[in-house]
Amino acid sequence: MSEIKTDDPKRGIKLRGADKTARIPIKVVPLQEKLKKPEWIRAKLPSRKFFEIKDILREQKMHTVCEEASCPNIGECFSKGTATFMIMGDICTRRCPFCDVGHGRPNMLDPDEPKNLAESVKAMNLRYVVITSVDRDDLRDGGAQHFADCIKAIRETSPNTKIEILVPDFRGRLDIALKILAETPPDVMNHNLETHPSLYRKARPGANYQHSLDLLKRYKEMMPHIPTKSGIMVGLGETDEDVREIMRDMRAHNIEMITIGQYLQPSDGHLPVLRYVTPEQFKIFEKEAYELGFTNAAIGAMVRSSYHADEQAAEALRESHGGCGHH
């Protein structure tokens, strides 16, 4: 799927932190005094396996969102031999001020990326792979065909590997994107709501809460056997009741799996953390999620969208009568 713009001198320049968020509608104002990080926010130290995987990734010229988004669980996940791959480059066309991925005009798609990704998955011997991407508003299908090409390539070389895709919102391109991803389905379809709709102007400029809900609802209607999943962060200014409202909205749109984790500010140029949710409150959210009918809820301070995704999916795939029919 070809890009809309070609020979652009600004293509490939990546802005991060304050440079990235300088032109969003609501300015990022640092707190006068940062909230102290509580003792329950702890990441595990990396093992030797972590460095082995890093070597494989550099060899294959692959980007993982684990590295690009400065994920706190990178040591633990790499050490278990799992990784979330970010396709279509590491430059995003959006400027969300909670996110540590760079903004700019992305490079052309790499036609070898699906093959390289499949080789990485095979070399790392992954049982479960998560594929995500930057937003590509410069592509006519938002990058859906590239996702499909990556799924096909992995299915060919690692037929027993389960594949979860964590997709952008395909704004303005949803019909074509859903059609493409229904023709080449993953094992789990994930798209994050990120936060409460009242905070979208501040945290997700350019996105729409109802559009994101509709994306997952429509995909579920097209592909009833594929589990759907979404996630949010807490600490951006939402209340506990806001979190409950999001959970109810997810269930009303047939979303089956949920992740909720603590937002951690990547740099002073990003949105500040306005609260640290306690482990006790995360437990309450988890209990309420199961009461609402989610098949799986990964909820806790250090949870990120793909954290323990393999364990989450095993549960959901059992619920969806033993898988999706392509293995």
Curated annotation (Swiss-Prot):
Cofactor, free-text remark: Binds 2 [4Fe-4S] clusters per subunit. One cluster is coordinated with 3 cysteines and an exchangeable S-adenosyl-L-methionine.
GO molecular function terms attached to this record: 4 iron, 4 sulfur cluster binding; lipoate synthase activity; metal ion binding
Entry cofactors: [4Fe-4S] cluster
Subcellular locations according to the entry: Cytoplasm
Pfam family for this entry, one: Radical_SAM
Catalysed reaction, written as an equation: [[Fe-S] cluster scaffold protein carrying a second [4Fe-4S](2+) cluster] + N(6)-octanoyl-L-lysyl-[protein] + 2 oxidized [2Fe-2S]-[ferredoxin] + 2 S-adenosyl-L-methionine + 4 H(+) = [[Fe-S] cluster scaffold protein] + N(6)-[(R)-dihydrolipoyl]-L-lysyl-[protein] + 4 Fe(3+) + 2 hydrogen sulfide + 2 5'-deoxyadenosine + 2 L-methionine + 2 reduced [2Fe-2S]-[ferredoxin]
Family: Belongs to the radical SAM superfamily. Lipoyl synthase family.
Protein name as catalogued: Lipoyl synthase
Lineage: Bacteria, Pseudomonadati, Pseudomonadota, Betaproteobacteria, Neisseriales
